[in-house]
């Protein structure tokens, strides 16, 4: 069981807001140390629990991701974990009405510029990601998965080929010296073999 310190707790009649601070452990994560807020509002006339993104959580603008266009960039696993935690709390207090959960990250829009999100068409903030709720030092795996997500998105839009460059120098050369569509470029870092394998 994970115990986290709560910050900025605010309780009103039908609403409660609190935040936790992300601990990325040994992972070199741009989101390390940021506050992630949850706002939970009672919706007595409903029986549904909903989860959405607020300020600093990105919105999907292109097809090919786990969420539909227009939805908050909250991946299925963390969304399911949030729903389960809220359902458990509602059961504990015998509450049977609806609840609206809004996740927000005040620094999210600024931090998102340092992530893959702009390339994936996620605008306005970061993505809420995860598979277990615990950060593991697996940056290499995370980068390869990010490349795979970007590739899948291109293919879902009907593109038949992609251009792979190791990094910024290759991307700059492509833009300045070759008559090729730059928007089809994917940066693969040192993972050329893995990228080719995923393309096959």
Residue positions per predicted region:
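A structural signal for small-residue-enriched, beta-sheet-centric alpha/beta enzyme cores
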Residues: 120-126, 131-200
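Generic N-terminal targeting/processing segments that precede catalytic cores or assembly contacts
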Residues: 1-120
């Amino acid at each position: 069981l994970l115990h986290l310190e709560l910050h900025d707790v605010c309780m009103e009649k039908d609403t409660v807001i609190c935040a936790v601070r992300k601990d990325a452990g040994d992972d070199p994560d741009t989101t390390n140390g940021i506050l992630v807020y949850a706002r939970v509002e009672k919706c007595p006339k409903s029986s549904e629990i909903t989860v959405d993104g607020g300020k600093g959580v990105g919105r999907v603008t292109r097809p090919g991701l786990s969420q539909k266009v227009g939805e908050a960039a909250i991946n299925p696993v963390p969304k399911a974990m949030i729903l389960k935690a809220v359902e458990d709390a509602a059961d504990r207090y015998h509450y049977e009405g609806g609840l609206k959960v809004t996740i927000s990250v005040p620094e999210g829009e600024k931090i998102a510029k340092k992530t893959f999100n702009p390339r994936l068409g996620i605008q306005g903030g970061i993505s809420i990601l995860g598979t277990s709720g615990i950060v593991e030092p697996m940056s290499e795996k995370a980068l390869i998965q990010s490349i795979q997500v970007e590739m899948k998105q291109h293919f879902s839009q009907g593109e038949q080929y992609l251009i792979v460059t190791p990094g910024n120098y290759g991307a700059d050369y492509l833009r300045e010296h070759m008559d090729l569509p730059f928007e089809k470029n994917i940066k693969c870092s040192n993972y050329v073999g893995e990228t080719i394998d995923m393309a096959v």
